[in-house]
Amino acid sequence: MKKFFITANWKLNGNIKMISSFFKYLKLYSSSYLEKNTVIIAPPTIYLERVCKNISNMNIFLGSQNVDINLNGAFTGETSILMLRDIGVKYVIIGHSERRFLHHETDDIIAKKFHLIKKSNLTPILCVGETEIEKKHNQTEQVIQRQLNLILKNLGTSAFKNIIIAYEPIWAIGTGVSADPEHVQLIHVFIKNYILKYSSINRNDIIIQYGGSINHTNVKKFIEQPDINGLLIGNSSLSAKEFLEIIKIAHEHYS
């Protein structure tokens, strides 16, 4: 059975005490709910190794929120793919709107990161999505095409095999206002159809997560959509209880 992919993006949050209590709770209550899900946790870089130790005997994978395009050298403050792989990272988030806007990351930079992650046999979680203004001007599909095209051009039709795409409409991130699940379903179908125009990979092998103001009260309607294959969760992943509630709902749907 195909698994549901749930990624926790902690962003710039967490501390040693929080991490300890978070995993203490998960270890007590989560064991029977992880089988039907692939759960990934992406903490701040400084806590990657601590989280790695906590998940060593759990069915949870380690993710990174970012990676540099350089492997080594005089690049103060950066983290290379070799370092991430060395400590056990399996998934790397790239293209998040906060990186695009706050750190001025272009489609070209994101495509380079994508290539580096694939070359290192890790799995990229590629974020795409439109702003509220772009949505109002009916530019959602055009924006997503642009965000995918450079990767497709540089890496060819095999680029989208064994990856995760995360559709995160920027107007829904951290606002408390989630997108309509049926609208998200249509966008996911569009993304899959667009990829399949250029690639012969199996449709069922295209994994697309949704991200944007997800919580345990609204998640069921998203999980029920056939082309929503996972979730990229921000604020709701900081509470072990809330995060586990979401995992439980996904587990029950896929049981």
From Swiss-Prot:
It is an enzyme of class 5 (isomerase). Homodimer. One of its GO terms (biological process) is glyceraldehyde-3-phosphate biosynthetic process. It is found in: Cytoplasm. Its EC number is 5.3.1.1. Pathway: Carbohydrate biosynthesis; gluconeogenesis; Carbohydrate degradation; glycolysis; D-glyceraldehyde 3-phosphate from glycerone phosphate: step 1/1. One of its GO terms (cellular component) is cytosol. Belongs to the triosephosphate isomerase family. It comes from Buchnera aphidicola subsp. Acyrthosiphon pisum (strain APS) (Acyrthosiphon pisum symbiotic bacterium). Its main location: cytoplasm. It holds the Pfam family TIM. It catalyses: D-glyceraldehyde 3-phosphate = dihydroxyacetone phosphate. The keyword Cell division does not apply. This is Triosephosphate isomerase. The gene is tpiA.
